[in-house]
Curated annotation (Swiss-Prot):
CDD domains from the UniProt entry: TrwB_TraG_TraD_VirD4
Main location: membrane
Transmembrane segments: 25-45, 56-76, 88-108, 136-156, 157-177
Compositional bias (Basic and acidic residues): 212-221
One GO cellular component, as annotated: plasma membrane
Protein name: DNA translocase FtsK
Assembly with partners or alone: Homohexamer. Forms a ring that surrounds DNA.
Stored SUPFAM superfamilies: P-loop containing nucleoside triphosphate hydrolases (SSF52540), Winged helix' DNA-binding domain (SSF46785)
Key word Electron transport present: no
Domain notes: Consists of an N-terminal domain, which is sufficient for the localization to the septal ring and is required for cell division, followed by a linker domain, and a C-terminal domain, which forms the translocation motor involved in chromosome segregation. The C-terminal domain can be further subdivided into alpha, beta and gamma subdomains. The alpha and beta subdomains form the DNA pump, and the gamma subdomain is a regulatory subdomain.
UniProt region (Disordered), positions on chain: 212-235
Residue spans, topological domain Cytoplasmic: 178-793
Organism of provenance: Bacillus anthracis
Amino acid sequence: MAKQKQRGTKAKARRTIKPTLYYEIVGLTLFALSIITILQLGVVGKSFVLFFRFFFGEWYIIGVLGVIALSVSFVIKRGWPNLLNKRLIGFYLIVLAILMFSHITLFNLLTKDGAVQNTSVIVSTKDNFFLEMKKGPDSVHLGGGMFGALMFATCYFLFDEVGAYIIGIILVILGILCITNKHIGEVLAPVGRILRSQFQVMQGDYKDWRAKRTAEQTEKKKTTRSTRSKRATEQEEIIEPMEEISIDPPIISNFTENYPVNEQEDKRIEVEQEELITSPFIEEAPPVEEPKKKRGEKIVESLEGETQAPPMQFSNVENKDYKLPALDILKFPKNKQVTNENAEIYENARKLERTFQSFGVKAKVTKVHRGPAVTKYEVYPDMGVKVSKIVGLSDDLALALAAKDIRIEAPIPGKSAVGIEVPNSEVSMVTLREVLDSKANNHPEEKLLIGLGRDITGEAVLARLNKMPHLLVAGATGSGKSVCINGIIVSILMRAKPHEVKLMMIDPKMVELNVYNGVPHLLTPVVTDPKKASQALKKVVSEMERRYELFAHSGTRNIEGYNDYIKEHNNQSEAKQPELPYIVVIVDELADLMMVASSDVEDAIMRLAQMARAAGIHLIIATQRPSVDVITGVIKANIPSRIAFAVSSQTDSRTILDGGGAEKLLGRGDMLFIPIGASKPVRVQGAFLSDDEVERVVEYVIGQQKAQYQEDMIPQDVPDTKQEVEDELYDEAVQLVVEMQTASVSMLQRRFRVGYTRAARLIDAMEMNGVVGPYEGSKPREVLINDVQEKSS
């Protein structure tokens, strides 16, 4: 009886404790599973992640957090919470809106990429979920899950996509109202108060700004009136009131810092190079690898089968004893002494900024580059300052700096700055030796690398002639053209052996290039007769055509490929074939050639400029008369690389560079160099080369090897076909034809009142003496000379 009573007490106690333990156990279990799900621990964690992602998609963490909140409620309250109270309903509405927005965004992206295979949103979401089950959690984007898919499908079917967005926004607003337990007016009232207060603050700030601006404009007008009155009395008074302006010192880049040259280094170099038989341009021959047998056999067979190939004209082979000239032949540059140049640069920078301020231009000098002849000030304008306003102040800036002339580069390529180039008080000489001794010249394999000078930053400027591929040099008399041409020729002589580069020089002035007669690099003696010049150019055209025939027979495309082809053949065959050298044609005065035989010269130059690059033939044309009848449009179109020295007018500058700037150069080697592909020209101080240095280089080269001229390239004497004409009207007829620049028998009949027979004899005599061209049917005959030539003859 006692035992039965004890069992009943225990059962009763078990029945009274069970509900509380049940909720605590369920709460702790749900909490543990939620943590495992968040951390994705094991198979259980990953499975629950997939479960929640199926319903909530990428927002599955909301479902997990909801389970955590439910577990905490079980443990604390030990009972079921009210899941349908007003605040929770508001939370549900916001979550549904978020899931729907997420699903709309997902399907817009999938539709744009064409990744949607099924038009049903629910089916597509289910397919994506099954795909994720295969690949693993977080491998596929599920948007808002199945809840989001149901919401999106329903709203899209009823209201379209825009209506779905509107429904989502309404759900968010209703959710906020349910959570806050307020109506719309109470919720929006704080927002309205904030907007109203911000508007009042902005209104007050605008009134203050307007009053301040009015005061500044009034003060500015007073300052402008006082400044104008002071400027009328004395210029110094403009600067005095601005002495209190704090100007940050600009960064000065001096080109003389790149010069390690001094007398001790000169002596050290002389000790190291005791004899003039070594050169920094001599390249060591790389070891020749034995080509494969099959390739060699093909080359030999192809060369043996070339029965139609034209014969080689350049038969001279490499002279193993030839030594390139050393740099010691050229003079060492003098040390550049820097005294108070930095102080002058700082003062000029202050003057520039003061001048800008006096004209109402907000700009600041931030960096200065001192070059050999000019100093470049980099000016950074403030936002809203027009570049054209700075360019328009060029004369005022020159007046403030007391400069001869200034050049404005607006803007500097690659920088948001304007460059103002001011001439130096003293021009520092740049020698060819220091240019060739720079690091940029450390390319012994480049046989056509020529030295030009130094730019404004002090860097050596060298150019590859084979990349240009032709060069036009123009400028007024005494501006430095001849020195530039000599520097180019000496650069080639210092780098290339006679079998590598050949030269043809045309010098109608007879004094500039005659010093190079006897150089082994010459194809012919220097051509000084203008009538022979056109013949020489035609021979170069014939050589170009012959080379293209060689390229066609050998299956190559340019001179580099052909020479590599010949090297492989010579390694495999005993019958050696010479390589093709580069040919550089130098014309020192184009204007004189155009006067004598304009049509022939222009046609030859046009053909060479258009086609000669691949054949290894390059033109360097110089002229001191940059007019459109000398530098024609055809020549300019085919010679993109140009050098402009100082000219007298902007028209001449446009003829050379297709733009202004050369009229503001200083002369004495100051040039604008625009290589092929450049958007703007580069200002360069040309390298100086004395006549004594040229003679020493020529003597050394001639001492290494004597000249072997190519007979086929030497122009023949032009026979004088002029004959004396007995008719007393001949001279008057020639003068009339030259003045009218047209010739016909009928014109002579009308003007001189003669018969047809006599007028026809006069025309025939003019044709025989080279005054007019041949008969061209109904067209008038071409007049071959102009008024200037007729007077000179």
